[in-house]
Regions:
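Cytosolic, membrane-interface loops and tails of multi-pass inner-membrane proteins
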Residues: 1-9, 67-93
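Topogenic membrane-insertion module of multi-pass membrane proteins
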Residues: 1-44, 48, 145
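Internal alpha-helical transmembrane segments of multi-pass membrane proteins, especially GPCRs
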Residues: 14-18, 47, 51, 100-103, ...
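Alpha-helical transmembrane segments of multipass membrane proteins
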Residues: 27, 52, 56, 60, ...
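Membrane-embedded alpha-helical segments that form the functional core of polytopic membrane enzymes
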Residues: 30, 39-66, 125-136, 173-176
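Early transmembrane hairpin module of multi-pass membrane proteins
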Residues: 56, 60-70, 96-104
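Intramembrane alpha-helical segments
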Residues: 85-172
Length: 176
């Protein structure tokens, strides 16, 4: 009942598990603070990076929930289903709605990534490609093969902080 009283944006925020996007926001803040420290911060690019990374993380959360649901991992007994809303598992949204959210959220993230590639240059391409790889393949097969935690370490560390630093500052730094 409460679900249907929410507008589309409220339902989307719940579906993407917006409460955990703080992890991504924190990595982006770190990249921005490092660029600010080195007096190379471009605020406009930082805002784009932050929005793009949060949308990519949101896309991954949607893919994660959809994949786990369709593979039978998520059901009423699944731990996360007991403390948080799983719209697909609880029948609050259809598979088509989930695919639509994945597509639209993913296209928005990719659009920002392509804009940053155009604005900052070709070094953004491998960062964008790595980000796409982890968004698409974190849930399966990486997590299934026991590589989920190392992937998280790579994504929220060097990729988001180091890559974010490059995009907002225009400089590559191995120290960062």
């Amino acid at each position: 009942e409460q679900w249907h009283q929410l507008d589309w944006f409220g339902r989307w925020l719940i579906s993407v598990r917006a409460s955990v996007l703080i992890m991504t926001f924190s990595s982006s803040i770190l990249a921005g603070l490092l660029a600010w420290y080195f007096s190379t911060l471009d605020w406009g690019l930082w805002c784009l990076v932050t929005l793009g990374l949060c949308l990519a993380h949101a896309t991954n959360n949607l893919i994660n929930d959809a994949t786990d649901y369709w593979r039978g991992v998520d059901d009423d007994r699944y731990m996360r289903n007991q403390y948080g809303v799983q719209p697909l598992t609880r029948g609050l949204m259809s598979g088509v709605d989930m695919l639509l959210q994945i597509g639209l959220t993913g296209m928005a993230a990719l659009g920002i990534g392509l804009l940053l590639l155009w604005l900052r240059g070709e070094l953004v391409l491998p960062l964008l490609a790595a980000g796409c790889f982890f968004v698409l393949f974190y849930t399966w097969p990486l997590k299934k093969w026991g590589l989920g935690e190392p992937a998280v370490l790579l994504v929220w560390g060097p990729l988001m902080v180091g890559g974010g630093f490059y995009v907002v500052s225009g400089q590559w730094s191995w120290l960062v």
